[in-house]
């Protein structure tokens, strides 16, 4: 495969993408710092700013190292504005994924993830380490699943939503677009669009939020 470009050097989750690339034996062409501020890269020599992005770099496939859906969408828009057209789905070799899994472009699946059969992951979705998704799960575009999340079968997570660390979502539950499930929550019923829920059982704490960190997609 071509060398890979990672967008988002200012995000601390970057190091996990670098480790996945190492486990896969993928070479990095560059790591783009798309915002002012320090870089979290393990390989600092690969870090460049937006002004240094070249046509040669844009010929390589790209992934995005940002957990917040709105930030990931912003970085994607930046990359497309520079002329990027190739977006790679990066799947850690320690993840257990079914042969029936459907993935779109730009997906990241971190280490030790388990996904059940007949599930689908939308474009630019992000599945963080040790999450366990049941069979027939659907994760929408730009949605982010936090570390250690557990879902039952037939769960649906809407576009741009975030499921916090260690949350549990019972079978058949639907999470709306740009919703946020707080860390450690147990979700027993459907969650509407743009809602923040938390607790065991999870209840609505806020409605009309833009999204995670008040940035929607």
What positions do the PLM features span?
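Structural signal for interior beta-strand "rungs" in well-ordered beta-sheet cores
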Residues: 90-198, 202-205
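Phosphate-bearing ligand-interacting subdomains
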Residues: 36-96
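Short hydrophobic segments within beta-strands
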Residues: 6-8, 32, 65, 182
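NAD(P)-binding Rossmann-fold cofactor-contacting core
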Residues: 23-40
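Short amphipathic alpha-helical segments
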Residues: 17-19, 74-78, 121, 193, ...
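Glycine-rich adenosine-cofactor-binding loop
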Residues: 2-21
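Short active-site oxyanion
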Residues: 2-5, 28-29, 59-63, 177
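Short, solvent-exposed amphipathic alpha-helical segments in soluble enzyme
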Residues: 20-25, 79-81
């Amino acid at each position: 495969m071509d060398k890979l470009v990672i967008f988002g050097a200012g995000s601390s989750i970057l190091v996990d993408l670098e480790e996945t690339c190492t486990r896969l034996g993928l070479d990095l062409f560059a790591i783009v710092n798309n915002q002012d501020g320090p870089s979290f890269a393990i390989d600092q020599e690969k870090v460049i700013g937006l002004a240094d992005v070249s046509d040669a770099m844009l010929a390589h496939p790209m992934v995005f190292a940002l957990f917040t859906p709105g930030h990931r969408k912003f970085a994607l828009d930046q990359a497309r504005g520079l002329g990027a057209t190739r977006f790679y789905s990066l799947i850690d070799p320690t993840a257990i994924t079914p042969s029936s899994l459907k993935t779109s472009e730009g997906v990241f699946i971190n280490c030790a993830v388990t996904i059940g059969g007949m599930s689908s992951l939308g474009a630019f979705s992000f599945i963080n380490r040790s999450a366990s998704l049941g069979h027939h799960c659907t994760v929408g575009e730009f949605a982010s699943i936090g570390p250690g999340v557990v879902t039952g079968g037939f769960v649906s997570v809407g576009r741009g939503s975030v499921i916090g660390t260690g949350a549990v979502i019972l079978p058949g539950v639907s999470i709306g677009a740009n919703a946020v499930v707080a860390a450690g929550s147990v979700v027993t019923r459907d969650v509407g669009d743009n809602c923040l829920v938390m607790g065991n059982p999870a209840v609505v704490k806020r409605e009309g939020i833009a999204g995670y960190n008040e940035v929607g997609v």
